[in-house]
Amino acid sequence: MQHYVTPDLCDAYPDLVQVLEPMFSNFGGRDSFGGQIVTIKCFEDNSLVKEQVELDGKGKVLVVDGGGSLRRALLGDMLAEKAAKNGWEGLVIYGCVRDVDVLIQTDVGVQALASHPMKTDKRGIGDLNVVVAFAGVTFRPGEYVYADNNGVLVSPSPLEMPE
């Protein structure tokens, strides 16, 4: 597992990276994570999140535009454990998570706005691999996202940690 330090990436690639507005917190078991972006756009319905974490996620990060909702959790312990089992590097969720005491022990990166104990409805509503924008940054499927306890950033191409 590669370790990323976002301040070092910003210093090495200042003209390449976009940094998300500082509103995310680390809820996962990895201090840092990075990979190719897979996007979901949904609102208080995590049906597509459930579908995606059941697929192979090696080298990928699931970026979920949950509309910034603070009323439902888009990720909990069971889906996080599936994501870890299927090799996902992490998830960036513009929304809430739950089961935070278990998430912090799960081998997957999770950046989200807050915790909330209420689960979502599963109505099968949402869009997969569409361009999404939140926190002042646009996320395009196939680009790259990197996160640690300092913040989250996006790059159009893969980045190497400087020596």
Curated annotation (Swiss-Prot):
GO terms for biological process: regulation of RNA metabolic process. Substrate binds at residues 76-79, 98. Belongs to the class II aldolase/RraA-like family. Pfam families: RraA-like. Its cofactor is a divalent metal cation. Homotrimer. Catalyzes the aldol cleavage of 4-hydroxy-4-methyl-2-oxoglutarate (HMG) into 2 molecules of pyruvate. Also contains a secondary oxaloacetate (OAA) decarboxylase activity due to the common pyruvate enolate transition state formed following C-C bond cleavage in the retro-aldol and decarboxylation reactions. This is Putative 4-hydroxy-4-methyl-2-oxoglutarate aldolase. It catalyses: 4-hydroxy-4-methyl-2-oxoglutarate = 2 pyruvate; oxaloacetate + H(+) = pyruvate + CO2. InterPro entries: RraA, RraA/RraA-like, RraA/RraA-like_sf. A divalent metal cation binds at residue 99. Divalent metal cation. It comes from Pseudomonas putida (strain GB-1). It is an enzyme of class 4 (lyase). Its EC number is 4.1.3.17, 4.1.1.112. Keywords: Lyase, Metal-binding. One of its GO terms (molecular function) is ribonuclease inhibitor activity.
